[in-house]
From Swiss-Prot:
Family affiliation: Belongs to the ATPase alpha/beta chains family.
Keywords for the protein's UniProt record, in alphabetical order: ATP synthesis, ATP-binding, Cell inner membrane, Cell membrane, CF(1), Hydrogen ion transport, Ion transport, Membrane, Nucleotide-binding, Translocase, Transport
Protein name: ATP synthase subunit alpha
InterPro entries registered for this protein in UniProt: ATP_synth_asu-like_sf (IPR023366), ATP_synth_asu_C (IPR000793), ATP_synth_asu_C_sf (IPR038376), ATP_synth_F1_a_nt-bd_dom (IPR033732), ATP_synth_F1_asu (IPR005294), ATPase_a/bsu_AS (IPR020003), ATPase_F1/V1/A1_a/bsu_N (IPR004100), ATPase_F1/V1/A1_a/bsu_N_sf (IPR036121)
One GO CC term on file: plasma membrane
Pfam families referenced in this protein's UniProt entry, alphabetically: ATP-synt_ab (PF00006), ATP-synt_ab_C (PF00306), ATP-synt_ab_N (PF02874)
One MF annotation (Gene Ontology) recorded for this entry: ATP binding
Catalyses which reaction(s): ATP + H2O + 4 H(+)(in) = ADP + phosphate + 5 H(+)(out)
Amino acid sequence: MQLSPSEISGLIKQRIEKFDNSVELKSEGTIVSVADGIVTIYGLNDVVAGEMIKLPGDVYGLALNLNTDSVGAVVLGDYEHIKEGDKAYCTGRILEVPVGEALLGRVVDALGNPIDGKGEVATDLTSPIEKIAPGVIWRKSVDQALQTGIKSIDSMVPIGRGQRELIIGDRQIGKTAIAVDTIINQKGTGVKCIYVAIGQKASTIANIVRQLEEHGAMEHTIIVAATASDSAALQYIAPYAGCSMGEYFRDRGQDALIVYDDLTKQAWAYRQISLLLRRPPGREAYPGDVFYLHSRLLERAARVNEEYVEKFTNGEVKGKTGSLTALPIIETQAGDISAFVPTNVISITDGQIFLETDLFNSGLRPAINPGNSVSRVGGAAQTKIIKKLGGGIRLALAQYRELEAFSQFASDLDEATRAQLNRGQRVTELLKQKQFSTLSVALMALSLYAADNGYLDNLEVSEVIPFESALHALAETKYSDVIAEINETGKYDADIADKLKIIVEDCKANQAW
């Protein structure tokens, strides 16, 4: 087919009219050094703090140091193929991770990539890892209980939805066990859980996944793993990634719980990155902004009001509040809670659960020290029946600890003192609880009622746990209607007190233990 000259000129005119002459500007830099996961780039003039930088080999870096003529970035992945003279490009994006319901039941790395061998995560939703925490005007006071199922916590150091409660203690003392039990206890409550493992062995994380699967808790849990073999950069960003996944549920009027295990290792990773970036070291060689590292993370855990949820969802969800409860874990060295990072996190959080090595070694597990443990806002959220019955437990323990030290020097004690010591020993024994044996509100109330009203006083210390087991078994079989009523309402009145009395006296009469 031949075209006439007029047709050719017409075609050329059409092409010229359709020609798009827009220019795409790309900020390009040159890598001048690469070492220990840190790259220094010259020429990236348009980069912003926290921006993702495209590096060779489909790897990204995170811009942390913005100098006059260079940029210091930390590599998010393998950097062995990167060499001096390679090109780096601005992306104009900040780091985002996948979020949504599809992540439940999955194990992902700090960037949200699945590492459990179950295929891709079926979600298109993403969220930036760094977000500004909700302002004061959008927050609601904590007034709903988050039951851990652990007697000593729910009765003495209660946790509310939207609270930040620190778990602090030495290594190998049961910190993770408390967090895992709390996650297991959320089964059937609608609370979504995120467990962030920072700097742990891969075998330890695999063991936690197995425990959660065995107890049917993986269905409502996301695990974010930055293992000990991962780079310091991934260990540093893992808590922020997990927090964004939890905020997805909070902002849509749901309740979520996040465990950071543990923030000491995140602080170590951040210290390593900061020193490699040649930032000036301060106390214990930590950088000057290590407080901000944890405060900007933990302030994102909050209870938000109905207006916030409605505004965020563009009116799709109305009349619902959302919450993100945080359980950060801090590992101390030889019980030193006055070190830099522990004091920082204690001052940021709404209370702490302090675990002691001596208590753990003496067989009291969970090894919670009620003297140093406190919940600053949880009391308002505590279930009414546990609040009423748990007050006597704390008092009995406080009196017991005071008298115990005194009684070592006194040869003969009066009857009242002996009775207080007697009750304190039995209450201490009652608060022992095995891992994976969380209790419902009703069964916990039953145990506390028995201790509060002196039903344990004439038992041998060794009989307390068998008596409690028999009491719970009797209540669940013979008095299941009472148990269901207490679990549903959580109220405490004269009628409930009478019903509890009947159950305890029935058990005492049977002597089934």
